[in-house]
């Protein structure tokens, strides 16, 4: 956690330096932009971290996940015992364990930190996966928590949000001034239209970057699951997913931390949070279960 806070501070500092350089190159007075930078950081990081802090509550509410407080069946007992054993092996606090009603084979992890997390599995997973395959899926989710992926994604999203807000307004101001022929003119309706369009365009590129990082993170979680449950079990779980790949019904806020993502070709692949299952299986076979 400490390393990620340091990374956050260094990244924030780098954002401010880069923004100042860009504004100087574009002929914008950086001293006039301090308010914009503060506003961008507040909105950019604020939204990401509020979502992170509320992630467990929102995930349980949006999926209808029922936390297992006292196991009532053999399956629930096995789930809790397996998560506890893997959490101890990964050096994290015991997450809450939940089951949500969903026909697809899926599971997800969420939470604000390594010691305050949630692991939930679908009823479809419990119905269609063997116990060894489900063990590997749980290991994958525990690896997400142990790697601090939720915090890292929140940091990255905050940086990207800040860039989008700042660049859209800086570039929008330059375009507006060029069109009006007056650098000192007030901001009119056209300026806000330009900024709105630029935020959508820059937001698409920011999403591509975030999803690229998310796909790399999935390979690491697969490797972590292989270490906790066994490489062959992890491969078998992914192969089972490839045979029973249905529509992902997880809410958008937890899809990135599910075991299974969407399917897409061409440009759509750039916006997927998960790599193709064939690539994940191939990476595991080539890695011998080592961390990636």
Curated annotation (Swiss-Prot):
GO CC term, one of those recorded: plasma membrane
Keyword presence, DNA-binding: no
Gene Ontology molecular function terms on file: metalloendopeptidase activity; zinc ion binding
Chief site of localization: membrane
Topological category with respect to the lipid bilayer: Multi-pass membrane protein
Gene3D superfamilies according to UniProt: Metalloproteases ('zincins'), catalytic domain (3.30.2010.10)
Cofactor binding notes: Binds 1 zinc ion per subunit.
Transmembrane segments: 5-25, 35-55, 155-175, 193-213
Catalytic site positions: 141
Positions bound to Zn(2+): 140, 144, 218
Subcellular location: Cell inner membrane
EC class: hydrolase
Enzyme Commission number: 3.4.24.-
Required co-factors: Zn(2+)
HAMAP family: Pept_M48_protease_HtpX
Family assignment from sequence similarity: Belongs to the peptidase M48B family.
Protein name as annotated: Protease HtpX
Gene source species: Xanthomonas campestris pv. campestris (strain 8004)
């Amino acid at each position: 956690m400490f390393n990620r806070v340091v990374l956050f501070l260094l990244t924030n500092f780098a954002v401010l330096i880069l923004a100042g350089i860009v504004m100087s190159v574009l002929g914008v007075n950086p001293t006039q932009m301090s308010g914009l930078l503060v506003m961008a950081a507040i909105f950019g990081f604020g939204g990401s971290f509020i979502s992170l802090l509320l992630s467990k509550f929102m995930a349980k509410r949006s999926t209808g996940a029922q936390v297992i407080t006292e196991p009532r069946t053999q399956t629930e007992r096995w789930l809790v015992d397996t998560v506890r054993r893997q959490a101890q092996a990964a050096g994290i606090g015991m997450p809450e364990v939940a089951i949500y009603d969903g026909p697809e084979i899926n599971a997800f992890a969420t939470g604000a930190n390594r010691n305050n997390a949630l692991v939930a599995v679908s009823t479809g997973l419990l119905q269609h996966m063997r116990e060894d395959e489900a063990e590997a899926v749980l290991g994958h989710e525990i690896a997400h928590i142990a790697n601090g992926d939720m915090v890292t994604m929140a940091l990255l999203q905050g940086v990207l949000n800040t860039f989008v807000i700042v660049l859209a307004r800086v570039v929008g101001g330059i375009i507006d001034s060029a069109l009006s022929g007056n650098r000192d003119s007030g901001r009119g309706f056209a300026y806000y239209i330009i900024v709105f369009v630029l935020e959508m365009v820059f937001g698409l590129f920011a999403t591509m970057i975030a999803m690229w990082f998310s796909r790399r993170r999935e390979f690491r979680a697969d490797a972590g699951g292989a270490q906790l449950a066994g490489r062959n079990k992890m491969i078998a779980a992914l192969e089972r997913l490839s045979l029973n790949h249905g529509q992902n019904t997880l809410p958008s806020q937890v899809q990135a931390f599910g075991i299974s993502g969407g399917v897409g070709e061409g440009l759509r692949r750039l916006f997927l949070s998960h790599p193709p299952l064939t690539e994940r299986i191939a990476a595991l076979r080539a890695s011998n279960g080592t961390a990636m």
